């Protein structure tokens, strides 16, 4: 499993964290001061990398959380058909079928960049 554990205090905006078992990119990170009877708390807000949903959690800053290792890979578009495209990974030469994002109009032989985590892929 490509995940590692980190303390909440080590997280930063722009990094990835598992929120509700979904890899998410941190959009907001804030901490509260320690109180008389408790430790400092951190509020982390993020957006799902693959589904785009907003999620958040609040935990003590010394709590451990899972951080996904999201791989950024290069690929070449082999063919385009409807809403899908076939992409060849430039490292392993494996052919993958992926959805075409709305803001992208790929053509054959275009090179693209995509994110991969535990079998999920998304064109960036």
Swiss-Prot record:
InterPro entries xref list: IF5A-like, IF5A-like_N, NA-bd_OB-fold, Rib_uL2_dom2, Trans_elong_IF5A_hypusine_site, Transl_elong_IF5A_arc, Transl_elong_IF5A_C, Translation_prot_SH3-like_sf
GO cellular component, one term: cytoplasm
UniProt-recorded Gene Ontology molecular function terms: ribosome binding; RNA binding; translation elongation factor activity; translation initiation factor activity
Keywords: Cytoplasm, Hypusine, Initiation factor, Protein biosynthesis
Domain of life the protein comes from: Archaea
Compartments it resides in: Cytoplasm
Residue(s) carrying Hypusine: 36
Annotated GO biological process: positive regulation of translational elongation; positive regulation of translational termination
Region (Disordered): 27-53
Cross-referenced Pfam families: IF5A-like_N (PF21485)
NCBIfam families: eIF_5A (TIGR00037), PRK03999.1 (NF003076)
Function: Functions by promoting the formation of the first peptide bond.
HAMAP family assigned to the protein according to its UniProt record, in alphabetical order: eIF_5A
Sequence similarity: Belongs to the eIF-5A family.
UniProt name for this protein: Translation initiation factor 5A
Organism from which the protein derives: Natronomonas pharaonis (strain ATCC 35678 / DSM 2160 / CIP 103997 / JCM 8858 / NBRC 14720 / NCIMB 2260 / Gabara)
Native organism taxonomy: Archaea, Methanobacteriati, Methanobacteriota, Stenosarchaea group, Halobacteria
């Amino acid at each position: 499993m490509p995940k590692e554990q980190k303390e909440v205090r080590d997280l930063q905006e722009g990094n990835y964290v598992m929120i509700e078992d979904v890899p998410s990119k941190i959009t907001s990170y804030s901490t509260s001061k320690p109180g008389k009877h408790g430790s400092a708390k951190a509020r982390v807000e993020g957006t799902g990398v693959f589904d785009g949903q907003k999620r958040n959690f609040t935990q003590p800053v010394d709590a451990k959380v899972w951080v996904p290792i999201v791989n950024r890979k290069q690929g070449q578009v082999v063919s385009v058909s409807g809403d899908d495209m076939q992409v060849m990974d430039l490292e392993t030469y494996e052919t993958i079928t992926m959805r075409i994002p709305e803001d992208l109009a790929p053509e054959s032989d275009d090179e693209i960049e995509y994110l991969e985590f535990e079998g999920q892929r998304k064109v960036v």
